[in-house]
Amino acid sequence: MSIFSHTFHTLSGESVALSQFQGQALLLFNSASQCGFTPQLTQFESIHEQYACQGLQIIGFPCNQFKNQEPGSNANIATFCTKNHGVSFLMSEKIEVNGPHAHPLWQELKSTKRGFLGTSAIKWNFTKFLIAPNGEVVLRAAPFTQPIKLIADIERVLHK
């Protein structure tokens, strides 16, 4: 299955097919509003502003599976992200990234690009995946990896 064959719903409930982004690079991550890594949202927005016109789509996937750090409704999440971090990139509705109810996209991401020591499970909020325009999952970055540290990888994928 291709990364671009998946769909998701935005925080407002709109269905989005990743196929519309085929030929563009994707930077996907799971998020939470009450996490120590939440300030990364501001960096993601800065990267979005700089690289969206070059073919990069950033999509955040709120998740409440790690210490209940995303307890709010989809509407609350949208307000928080916009008000506190100026988020204008796509954000999905709240999903699960691990377990039997994990979103199919995240199941594929985890099986395609394993984490530290070969584990597939997402260990914490703000795990990042960079996908090339051809659908190849290029890298998986740990939660503590600042988004700005991925710029060289993003540029390499965009200019292949």
Task: Please provide the spans of the model-predicted regions.
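Chalcogenol-based redox active-site neighborhoods
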Residues: M1-K160
